[in-house]
């Protein structure tokens, strides 16, 4: 019995000794994105930006956070979380209905960043139509405003990523 006690005690002390020697590895922060100037034709950039914009708009329209942030740089993904996204998407949906028309305008070279610009037209949300009717106005006779959409892109480690989107 005494031998069993000694053996068990030795085993416990050995396990404790090994676990005490183990140090927790510090959490590794991924390196910051390296944005490099990159030559790209406007046609190539437009193709990339069209896909990114479609993902972003679909994410906003359908409350799909993962689709919305899919094409953004890591730094943006680190600051935007589902809790911040929910009111952003709700606000977007309150102001804009479904995308009706999207017209590419141009690419702007802004040093290490490129801006791709479109003119967008959305359907009028139901709540806005109802508000117009309550005010005695016919929604069909009031044009839906167009928006200017600008997507800011940068080349991160050889891959184009979105850094910001602006609706004016």
Feature map (PLM): residue ranges:
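C-terminal motif of bacterial Sec signal peptides marking the signal peptidase cleavage site
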Residues: 17-20
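Alpha-helical interaction segments
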Residues: 8, 42, 55-59, 75, ...
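Short solvent-exposed beta->alpha transition segments
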Residues: 50-51, 66-115
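Short, charge-rich amphipathic segments
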Residues: 25, 62, 66-68, 158-160
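Short, low-complexity N-terminal intrinsically disordered segments enriched in polar/charged residues
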Residues: 22-62
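Exposed beta-sheet edge and beta->alpha loop/turn motif
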Residues: 105-168
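Bacterial N-terminal signal peptides that target proteins for export
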Residues: 1-9
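Repetitive helical segments and hydrophobic/amphipathic motifs
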Residues: 12-13
């Amino acid at each position: 019995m005494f031998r069993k006690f000694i053996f068990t005690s030795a085993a416990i002390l050995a396990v404790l000794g090994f676990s005490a020697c183990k140090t927790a590895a510090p959490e590794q922060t991924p390196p910051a994105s390296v944005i490099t100037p990159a030559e790209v034709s406007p046609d190539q950039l437009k193709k990339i930006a069209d896909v990114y914009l479609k993902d972003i708009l679909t994410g906003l329209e359908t409350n799909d956070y993962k689709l919305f942030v899919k094409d953004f740089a890591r730094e943006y993904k680190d600051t935007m979380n589902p809790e911040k996204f929910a009111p952003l998407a709700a606000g977007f949906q309150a102001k804009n209905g479904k995308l009706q028309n999207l017209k590419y305008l141009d690419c702007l070279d802004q040093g290490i960043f490129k801006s791709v610009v479109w003119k967008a037209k959305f359907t009028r949300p139901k709540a806005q139509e109802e508000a117009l009717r309550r005010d005695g106005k016919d929604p069909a006779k009031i044009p839906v405003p167009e928006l200017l959409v600008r997507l800011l892109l940068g080349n991160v480690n050889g891959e184009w990523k979105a850094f910001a989107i602006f609706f004016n």
